[in-house]
């Protein structure tokens, strides 16, 4: 029994231990699976980081490569620009040397000195110049670069500094006419020497400068310098005759030429000596002279300019030309001058502008032109002959003569006073026919108005139309007597009758006739002839005369309204129309009076 119980206990303990181990194993398996999942996540993240790193490295390398390429292009453009500028400067210097007649130096191959870092000239440390009073020492330029030295040996110019180059440069004097009158002692130092003999005696040496001795004095150096400069300028003048192009001469040069041509031979020789001492062809001012065209003419060409230039440039001097062309103009065209007071231009310019000549100005030119003759005067149209009728607007005045529309003369002063002549003379038959027969019943007011009109007719108006005062025409207005009730009624009826008149009749009555109103004697005779007329007959007779009186009174005011300051041009056609209207009015007035 005891053995079986022990076996059961052992079996139970094994089962218990087995369960414990199984539980631990399951926990470990779960833990391992979680770790494996974490490891896989980490691997994916690491792979992503590696890819990002690779992309960043590629971007960085590409950016650096682009930066290097851009920097390379920038440096390349800078180098090309610098080289191009150097080449342009070299070309400018070569053109200046050619224009001055100098030989080309070390600039046969301009790329060599630029690329080798040397322009063919030694550094400044090699130049040593000492001034010991009148003694001058010269030291040749040392060449350290063999290429530059070879180029220097091949070229025909030496770069040694002599006493002419060491001496400080004089200030350049302008070739002006004002300074020719100044006394300069340097101009008169070597007049007794003949420059042609000096030029023939001295040999022309370009490679080697004249050796300077220690015992030479200052005046000898100056004379030697003058000889050297004269030799160079003579050679340059021979070359410049073919090389230098002709430059347009400005008025400053021509003015100096005019004054020099008028001087004596002694003054011309002094000018040549002064120009010979002028340092206008030093290398410091050659570039400036190249850019300024009027300063580039040499002193050898100055005498040519003096001979060919005129005495003065004729800019506003047109009198000689007009004198030369007077005969031709008189043969072709007959000109008639008009006084300035009676003739003005349409533009209404100020009268001061008339003082200027009507001829065109001539532009200044030199004798380098092919045509030395003066050109003819230009006009914008054909010359005008004022004796012929003008082609402009015309007006007709009563004298039937043509008048230009541009005259200043007042047209009212030229009018023919026809009415004054008729009024001062014997009245015509037409005026007698125009007098109307007025019935006997006219009141005394008509007689008063007739007397006033007669007085006005005896005084002819001496003033023109635009100066007539309106107060003269207002005189016939006189206060009438008080009217009775019957007269007021009759006046109302007559006013309505005036409105009923047709347009043609009222229009005829607007024009005033001088002899329509009865005179004082006619009125007295009419009143005295019928003293015993009844009121009915008077009323019946007054009716037509009242109408005529009212229209004639209104016509006096229409004269004032009809006055206009503007003058109507009177032509033959207008006069014919006026005559026809007068005839019609006479016939109409005769019919009314009948």
UniProtKB/Swiss-Prot annotation:
InterPro entries assigned to the protein according to its UniProt record, in alphabetical order: Shugoshin_C, Shugoshin_N
Chain's role: Plays a central role in chromosome cohesion during cell division by preventing premature dissociation of cohesin complex from centromeres after prophase, when most of cohesin complex dissociates from chromosomes arms.
Principal subcellular localization: nucleus
Region (Disordered): 104-178, 201-266, 342-380, 519-549
Pfam families, per the entry: Shugoshin_C, Shugoshin_N
Location(s), subcellular: Nucleus; Chromosome, Centromere
Coiled coil, from the record: 38-61, 220-240
Source domain of life: Eukaryota
Alphabetical UniProt keywords: Cell cycle, Cell division, Centromere, Chromosome, Chromosome partition, Coiled coil, Nucleus
Biased composition (Basic and acidic residues): 224-239, 357-376
Single GO cellular component term: nucleus
GO BP terms, alphabetized: cell division; meiotic chromosome segregation
Similarity annotation: Belongs to the shugoshin family.
The name this protein goes by in its record: Shugoshin
Biased composition (Basic residues): 343-355
Biased composition (Polar residues): 252-261, 519-532, 539-549
